[in-house]
Amino acid sequence: MDAYGPKIGVMHMMGITICAVGRLRQKPEAVLVSNYVDRFNKLGRKLGFGLANLIEVEDKNGSGISAEAILLEKAIPKKSIICVLDENGKTLTSPNLASFLANCRDNSKNNVTFLIGGADGIEEGLKKKADYALSFGKMVWPHSLARVMLAEQIYRSATILLKTPYHRN
């Protein structure tokens, strides 16, 4: 089987969820995230993916990282592969992320959920429950930009799997 193409006869539609602390509201980053998610959703069905979506959680009491972890955990769809975004996580190339998503889909995973913490990151207990930890490099990024970067990489993954000219090596 080609890691970049859907299996013949694949009927399972694997969802992709981005769960993030805080709300972008009407910030420019919200427009970018929405744009990339919409673009992925238009291509994803051709590849056997369900819809990608963004779930934003907000600790209105300001209780901190532990309260954020509880809200994030409640937002994770059942039977989901959990990937935390963390500066100490594994760095992947764009084609590697595309292969990862294709492998999850081909192994009939229900959903892949990416978790993005707030200003203090993700609570250690929740990190330990994750199946994977991914990083955008050793630099720390604001959670609003991390959402944009992740949404773009998910869309880019679809373009890689479909072999469109969007991604150039």
For the regions a protein language model found, what residue spans apply to each?
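Short glycine-rich anion-binding loops that position phosphate/pyrophosphate groups of nucleotides
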Residues: L24, E87-K90, G118-G121
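Short hydrophobic segments within beta-strands
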Residues: C19-V21, I55-V57, L115
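N-terminal beta1-alpha1 ligand-phosphate binding loop
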Residues: G9-G44
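S-adenosyl-L-methionine/SAH cofactor-binding core of RNA-modifying enzymes
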Residues: R45-V112
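Structured adenosyl-cofactor binding patch, chiefly the S-adenosyl-L-methionine
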Residues: D120, E124-R168
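Short, acidic/small-residue loops that bind anionic groups at enzyme active sites
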Residues: D106-L115, G137-H143
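Conserved RecA-like P-loop NTPase ATPase core
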Residues: I18, C83, G117, L150
